[in-house]
Structure formats: C-alpha cells, structure tokens
Curated annotation (Swiss-Prot):
One of its GO terms (cellular component) is cytoplasm. Gene3D superfamilies: Adenine nucleotide alpha hydrolases-like domains (2.30.30.280), HUPs (3.40.50.620), Translation factors (2.40.30.10). It comes from Verminephrobacter eiseniae (strain EF01-2). This is tRNA-specific 2-thiouridylase MnmA. Belongs to the MnmA/TRMU family. Keywords: ATP-binding, Cytoplasm, Disulfide bond, Nucleotide-binding, RNA-binding, Transferase, tRNA processing, tRNA-binding. The record marks 128, 352 as: Interaction with tRNA. The active site is at residues 103, 201. One of its GO terms (molecular function) is tRNA binding. Disulfide bonds join 103-201. Residues 98-100 are annotated as: Interaction with target base in tRNA. It is an enzyme of class 2 (transferase). InterPro entries: MnmA-like, MnmA-like_C, MnmA-like_central, MnmA-like_central_sf, Rossmann-like_a/b/a_fold.
Length: 370
C-alpha cells in the first residue's frame, strides 16, 4: 500500500538499515517525512547490553543524509508496563512468551502511533517486511506477508487491528533484503552494512538465563525422562522451553539402545514442564512422540478484520520462520480457537503465537495454550 502524495509520514528510525531505507523511499516519493527514534528500555536497567545510544547516533546520521528531522522519544515506561511485565508473568507461569508480538501491538503501533498522530501525522511507517492493503469488497484492511519469505514479519504483526493498519505503511513489503542492502549502499546510507539486530533489546547479547535470573531467580527441581528416571537437576522451569536441546547439563547420559525415535547417542530435548511437581521432563531423539502434536488450542485471539474467520482449511505458523502448516479450524472466537494439523508439528510451545493465514493474507492468531 502506498501513501497519497505529500502526506505527513512519521517513520520509526531504529538505526538499522531497514528503517533507513524505508525513510529514504518515502522521501523520494515526495512525502513529508519525520523520523522518531523509540527508546524502549532504560540503559540503567540493562547493564550496557542494549546499545540504544549507538543506535540513536546511527539513526541521526541516516536522518541527516536523507534530509529529515528526527526526534528521540522515550517509551520505556510504557514498555515495562505493557510488555515486560507480561513477559515476566508468562515465564513465571511456565510458558515461553514472544515479547516482539506484544511490543508491536502495544508500543510500535499503539504508543508510537498515538505520538505520531499528535505530531500531525497522517501515516506511520516502519521497516517491517510485510504488506497492507484495503480489500475492495469488504472495505477492511488486510495484513499481507512480505515478498521475501526469509524476512516476512507478518507473524509478529498479527495482533494489529483496523485502526493501526489503516494508518500504517510498509514500504519494504515488496522488496527482498538483498535489494534493501543494495539500495542502501547505492545511495550512500552510513549504516548500509550494519549487522541486523537479533534477539530482544532488553536481553541484548548476554545469556538469556543470566538475564531472567535477575527477575525470577532459581527454583531447582528434578530432570526426569519419559519413564520417570531422574537424570539431574534443573535450575528453574522458567529457564527452559519446549524443544530446547542446549544447556540441559545431561549431555553425557545416554539411553541403553534405541528407543522412541532416538538411539543410544541421540540428543536430549525438553518435552514437558510440570509446574505442580516442578519437574522438567526430557526425551531422547528429535522425533520422540512427546515432541509431536497434531492439534493445538490457542487463547486470547486477535483477528485483524475484527471478527473470527469462518471454519475451514487454512495454514498456520506456530513459530517465526516456520513453513506454513496446513490445518483445519473447526470454530473460533475472540476467546480462542483450536487447530488440527494435516501433519505432526514439532515442539508446539505454550506462550508462543499460533498465527493463521489464508494464502498470502494474515488473518490473526492467538497465544498457544496447549
């Protein structure tokens, strides 16, 4: 979707190459472009792991080259209240949340959008690899997959609503990452070769367990296999997620003989977290039955068009960058939905998002309950 000529568009400038090219493209189209750098985490809270200062310098350098104004806005209080607090609650409940999904819905397309509108913006834009269009038949706005399958970010945007999409532009939706990099170099953007950010800003480059330990603390308990054999001790169920292979501390233990999809030298995987007994269940072998499921239930559903889709066959993702999985949805509502998959799905994880697609259109999704 493109903006009308000469609209006032506020762009979220992160300091990365994607948002930089986004701002450049909109400027080239003749729009009045203003950049906003969002500070979502206080430096005092992160021990220097979140390089917001460096990122702002990069964003300001980009704004200077493109010839636009940039404003530094602090959303840290909103982030802690709306995103981080929920992040901790989910981990304490034994689930594995995806804070990027909540951050998009609550900060980047709510707090940021509200701020941009106060500045007189008609649209906001970000460097996400996704698309938005208005369906001529229904008049509703639709969220589309990005053209680059390796970078498509519609999964993280599935909780956006009609108000948010109606005000949003995704200029990179039709481009591939290689094209964005090439364009950044061709026009001389100072961050053209900057490495893509990975992970969550408030965790940074530190080990995840080290970070989480500051807020939740250890709660040791037994590690048991699928037959109840005690293999070791875990440091707290919050520090593990389904399908996890590394960091279990039981790598030297091997089953005697092949069993359930794994031989004597097959690796161990986290299969269940039993909160009632504080027990971490592990199994040997990637294709152990405990790691496979044909159905899931999701709660706290959000539907982009405002109403649940009709029962039928769709595609779904239960994690980012997963290939679309064919499924059937028998019924759905605002409270939740249930999916049945054509093929077994691996390590479907409570707390992560189940996102539904009809071809190239993202319909919405919910939080996996089990």
């Amino acid at each position: 979707m493109t903006a009308s000529p000469k609209q006032r568009v506020v762009v979220g400038l992160s300091g990365g190459v994607d948002s930089a090219v986004t701002a450049y493209l909109l400027r080239q189209q003749g729009h009045e472009v203003v950049g906003i750098f969002m500070k979502n985490w206080e430096d005092d809270d992160d021990g220097g792991y979140c390089p917001s200062g460096t990122d702002f310098v990069d964003a300001a350098a980009v704004a200077d080259v493109i010839g636009i104004e940039i404003e530094h806005v602090n959303f840290a209080a909103d982030y802690k209240e709306r995103v981080f607090a929920e992040f901790l609650r989910e981990y304490q409940a034994g689930r594995t949340p995806n804070p990027d999904v909540l951050c998009n819905a609550e900060i980047k397309f709510k707090a940021f959008l509200d701020h941009a509108l106060r500045l007189g913006a008609e649209k906001i834009a970000t460097g996400h690899y996704a698309g938005v269009r208005r369906n001529p038949a229904s008049g509703r706005f639709e969220l589309l997959k990005g053209a680059d399958p390796a970078k498509d970010q519609s999964y993280f945007l599935h909780r956006l609503d009609q108000r948010q999409l109606s005000r949003t532009l995704f200029p990179l939706g039709a481009l591939r990452k290689t094209e964005v990099r090439r364009l950044a170099e061709d026009i001389g953007l100072p961050n053209a070769r900057k490495k893509d950010s990975t992970g969550i800003c408030f965790i940074g480059e530190r080990p995840f367990r080290e970070f989480l330990n500051r807020y939740i603390g250890p709660a040791p308990g037994p590690i048991e296999d699928d037959r109840g054999r005690v293999l070791g001790q875990h440091s707290g169920l919050s520090f593990y997620t389904l399908g996890q292979r590394q960091g279990l501390g039981i790598g030297g233990l091997k089953e005697q003989g092949a069993q359930r999809g794994g031989g004597a030298h097959a690796p161990w995987f986290v299969a269940r977290k039993e909160l009632a007994t504080n027990t971490l269940r592990v199994v040997q072998g990637h294709d152990h039955p405990w790691l496979l499921s044909r159905a899931l239930e999701a709660q706290d559903a959000r539907w982009i068009c405002g109403a649940a889709p009709a029962p039928g066959r769709y595609a779904a993702k239960t994690r980012y960058r997963q290939q679309d999985a064919s499924c059937t949805m028998a019924s759905a509502g605002q409270a939740g939905f249930r999916l049945h998959f054509s093929e077994e799905q691996w390590a479907v994880t409570p707390g992560q998002s189940a996102v539904l697609y009809d071809g190239n259109v993202c319909l919405g999704g919910g939080v996996i309950a089990g």
